[in-house]
Amino acid sequence: MSQLYDITIVGGGPVGLFAAFYAHLRQAKVQIIDSLPQLGGQPAILYPEKEILDVPGFPNLTGEELTNRLIEQLNGFDTPIHLNETVLEIDKQEEEFAITTSKGSHLTKTVIIAMGGGAFKPRPLELEGVEDYENIHYHVSNIQQYAGKKVTILGGGDSAVDWALAFEKIAPTTLVHRRDNFRALEHSVQALQESSVTIKTPFAPSQLLGDGKTLDKLEITKVKSDETETIDLDHLFVNYGFKSSVGNLKNWGLDLNRHKIIVNSKQESSQAGIYAIGDCCYYDGKIDLIATGLGEAPTAVNNAINYIDPEQKVQPKHSTSL
């Protein structure tokens, strides 16, 4: 028979990790279920060396460092962690919820869903032969290995701009974007414009030039024009964002808004006892940032505690008084 937990957290990214830690402060019995093979979510797997700019008080904090600190914080408590385990169904029983996964079942009094954007994979560069080239990349695991190399980055969002600024410190860097304007933080765009990064706008990649294994040059074409240019490069990084899939979420009986779980001011979904935090939840004015999700975690945990035992106050003691 499965153990009965007070809170089961679905998702082991930064927001889920902090929710688990905070739940322990409320002396809840908590576990984490994550479909990925490691904790940390996108920052750990896709952006381990990228600076995280929206966690206050920690300048130059990388995705890997953020993950390690959250795990270290959680290590002081007994937290069962189930990795490579996908949640298939969440069914309301009389007194608890039964969670069916790809590996078994779990019983829990409440559920906090912190699954981010769900399963994710990078949006690919769609040019002939792209799969054959070994020096086309979609994420960076060790930036120092590219020191002194000619780097070209495709994209116009925060990731593309941030990586261009990071690579500029160690390598000749070119940034190619199909529009004149970048979809990144204003401060980052200003830093880009003041940097030594070569900016090519509005251009789109049109042809890969190499021996079929190593890409040597990238042909780019000006948007709405026949004008072309050729860029010499050693490595090409594609930052076109990610395709995400919420998988079985639509089968869990929760009210959704464009694949996000609608929550109230308690972070509670349409099903009492099930809460959602981070990028997977929706409410009017919602901003998808790590900092936002970290703030939502205590709200969900405290209301889950109150759901389990209405005599427990939603507003707990401050951590400084514990």
Curated annotation (Swiss-Prot):
The record's remark on the cofactor is: Binds 1 FAD per subunit.
**From which domain of life does this come?**
Bacteria
Q: What are its cofactors?
A: FAD
Q: Which reaction does it catalyse?
A: 2 reduced [2Fe-2S]-[ferredoxin] + NADP(+) + H(+) = 2 oxidized [2Fe-2S]-[ferredoxin] + NADPH
EC no. given is: 1.18.1.2
Q: Does the keyword Membrane apply?
A: no
Alphabetically sorted, this entry's keywords are:
FAD, Flavoprotein, NADP, Oxidoreductase
One Gene Ontology biological process: cell redox homeostasis
Annotated protein name in UniProt:
Ferredoxin--NADP reductase
Species name:
Streptococcus pneumoniae (strain ATCC BAA-255 / R6)
